Amino acid sequence: MEDRREALISKLMNMLVENGFSVSGTGFQPVATFDIVARRDVERYILKVLYNIDTLKQSTAYQLIKLAKLLRATAAIIGERTGNGQLEDGVVYYRHGVPISSVNTFESYLNGERPYIYSGPGGFYVRINGELLRERRNELNLSIGNISSYLGVSRRSVSLYENGSAATIDIFIRLRNILKADIVDHIDLFRINSTEINFEEKISDEYIARIIWLLQKYGLDTRPIFKVPFDIVAKDSDEISLIAALIGDAPEPERVRILKKISDVFEDDAFLVSKSNTYRESIGGCAVLTISDLESIEDKDALIGKIEKRAK
């Protein structure tokens, strides 16, 4: 199954490049929170690839949503199967609040064709624009009772549709045929409401806890990140995002390389924080700072200036 997942990652990366995206991967690590980051102008995506989407863990979904919020990106999972069979093209699925689709559906979405069908308990559904439904019904001089008779549903169901409830595919098609109008609520099914998620977490590593405290002192929303090639992500209220990794005396070259590539794709600053004092100012194109450096920096602008200077 891992071979199939790796093939799916390669297919997705090729598709993104063909559609004008800059991309970076994490090296096919099956336990990683994400597999690909991609950017095209202002579009930023953090993607996890699963052959079977039912294998998604809640902890992975949580980290993916948190990371996307901090990096001002859209999180999504690209898959191929559920426990019941192949993913249907043109349909968005959800697991633990994260949108999921096939490669073909995601490519269509990137090219402006927003899917409007989503998978829910018992089948596929379409969100109805209740206001348009009501307006069109009145234009045709149809009562709620008329519509309910045509559809074979209760008046209450029609009232719910007019209040924005979703309809099954069968009901939606019949309703569209009756009204001869586009009554789809064209919301972005890939949009995640992360405001309902509590991102507070216990931090067991004293170094990471210290770094987070120091970055928060500069007015940066700073969080730990797990199962990724870095440890901390911070952002301000404007357009600045920072990615940081804690390193020891012998940093892993592959980890640094991936960190640098991710920061290049997103055009965000990445830096390494050394646990001990070091003479090195950069490794692999990433600035190196110590805890002492962070303690002596006065504000956010000075921090960014030091990172950019040492990264050169």
From Swiss-Prot:
Q: Which domain of life, per UniProt? A: Archaea
Looking at the record, the residues that make up the HTH cro/C1-type domain are: 133-186
Give the DNA-binding residue ranges: 144-163
UniProt keyword annotations, A-Z: DNA-binding, Transcription, Transcription regulation
Q: Which SUPFAM superfamilies match?
A: lambda repressor-like DNA-binding domains (SSF47413)
Kindly give the Pfam families that the UniProt entry links to this protein: HTH_3
The entry lists its GO molecular-function terms as: DNA binding; DNA-binding transcription factor activity
- For the keyword Transcription, the answer is yes
Q: Is DNA-binding given among the entry's keywords?
A: yes
- Report the InterPro entries cross-referenced here: Arc_TR_HTH (IPR020886), Cro/C1-type_HTH (IPR001387), Lambda_DNA-bd_dom_sf (IPR010982)
Q: Which NCBIfam families match?
A: PRK04140.1
Protein's recorded name? Putative HTH-type transcriptional regulatory protein TV0294
Task: State the organism of origin.
Answer: Thermoplasma volcanium (strain ATCC 51530 / DSM 4299 / JCM 9571 / NBRC 15438 / GSS1)
